[in-house]
């Protein structure tokens, strides 16, 4: 499952695509 995280405060690395 792939989803985008809208966490700009955490930084770009965390905002990139995360694979679950």
UniProtKB/Swiss-Prot annotation:
Leader sequence residues: none
Record has Endoplasmic reticulum as a keyword: yes
Keyword Chloroplast listed: no
Location in or out of the cell: Endoplasmic reticulum lumen
Main subcellular location: endoplasmic reticulum
GO cellular component terms listed in the entry, alphabetical order: endoplasmic reticulum lumen
Gene Ontology terms for molecular function: carbohydrate binding; metal ion binding
UniProt keyword annotations, A-Z: Calcium, Chaperone, Endoplasmic reticulum, Glycoprotein, Lectin, Metal-binding, Zinc
Post-translational modification remark: Glycosylated.
Family: Belongs to the calreticulin family.
Its job: Molecular calcium-binding chaperone promoting folding, oligomeric assembly and quality control in the ER via the calreticulin/calnexin cycle. This lectin may interact transiently with almost all of the monoglucosylated glycoproteins that are synthesized in the ER.
Protein name, as recorded: Calreticulin
Species for this entry: Spinacia oleracea (Spinach)
Lineage: Eukaryota, Viridiplantae, Streptophyta, Embryophyta, Tracheophyta
